[in-house]
Amino acid sequence: MKVSHIEHLGIAVKSLEEAIPYWENVLGLKCYAIEEVADQKVKTAFFKIGQTKIELLEPTSEDSTIAKYIENRGVGIHHMALACENIEEQLADAEAQGVRLNDKTPRKGAEGLTIAFLHPKSTQGILTELCEDKNK
């Protein structure tokens, strides 16, 4: 499997409205996009730090994965996303190496990226997202 860089860190928050001021006022970053990803039942806010982004994830439904994560673990880092090319190939390679896949088939994520998650039991306890920008 080949990845090029950390695309973003996903951080679970209860409220974007409450979380954004910390990133903007305390850290001096600018929120450049807010987007709802309906099929994942989340609303996201993005900040850029160098080549990497921070993605804040607010649940839009009590039965969303993020709402359940916050209920069980509290707010904080939810996942690490790694940029790659040929995501289908990367998933096949990961599976061939015994990595458990949350998503066997890539799907659409925020910012128009094609994404797939690897199970944390196979990735040293870190929920790992592969991201490909098919518009490049």
Task: For every predicted segment, state its role.
Residues 6, 13, 23, 47, ...:
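Short, structured motif recognition centered on aromatic/hydrophobic residues
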Residues 2, 6-14, 45-48, 67-136:
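Vicinal oxygen chelate
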Residues 19-22, 90-94:
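Hydrophobic side chains in well-ordered alpha-helices
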Residues 28-49, 53, 117-119:
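N-terminal strand-loop-strand beta-hairpin
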